[in-house]
Amino acid sequence: MALVVLLAVFTVATMQAAADYGIVINGYSVWEKNCNDLSGIKGVTGSVKYDPATKTLTLENATITGIGKERCLFNSECEGLRIVLKGSNRIVNNEEVGMEFRSATTICGPGTLDIRTNKKEAILFIYVPLTIEDCEITINSENTGIVGGFISEKSVLTVRNSRVDVNAKNGCVVYFGGIVLEDCAIVQPKGVVFDKGCMSLAIDGEIVKGRLLIGKPNYAISVAGVAVTKDNCNDLSVIDGVSGIVKYDGITRTLTLENATIAPGKSTVGIFNADCNDLTINVIG
């Protein structure tokens, strides 16, 4: 009888372990019994659900408010987790970390995410890569923003075609292994680089605190009242009032006009160089 009971307990424990997907929300594990609707978890509103087949956690117009000393969202061992944002989403935690990742995670759009923390990090990723793509994330933290947790080359942050606006008193993007920017750039402040000395985004060796903005690069030039960006720089003739060949090379800082006409509307400047040092305007024809 004792052996039967022991085997029964072991079987139940094994089943529970197999059903646990390695994701925790406000201290509650995500598993097969609740994954289709996680809005029943205390502190969660809106639509939150998990698909174990694709390892996709979807937040749709959702708010996760931290409860006590619990992290709002914790990926402990779901390797390759994708967090899909739909609509406007919020994570608020006054006591603990907003989001913590100990397995490789991707946060992706098309929606937005607003993270607010008071005492701890907004996003913490430890010894693993973190990817942010095709979305908008706004962070406001009385402590730190995006943090690698431990200084490790494995903690690489990739930001792809996204806007990440970090406001953090004690450091915006700090203590991580490196950064990869694709179809976006550090827009503000100027002069920010990844500093291997402090393993953080810094200016002249000083960690950036306050505000740091990653977004679509703006070349500080406008043509017929329209900002020149990475999206439109190869063909500026699509701008109203512009004809012929007008294009901009962000690497050489060269604006080329070839048999072009720029006829902006009333009170609009044809070409305005707001802050592009060493701009060259190449006129052909």
Name the predicted role of every residue range.
Residues M1-A19:
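Sec-dependent, cleavable N-terminal signal peptides
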Residues Q16-G285:
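A composition-driven surface/loop motif
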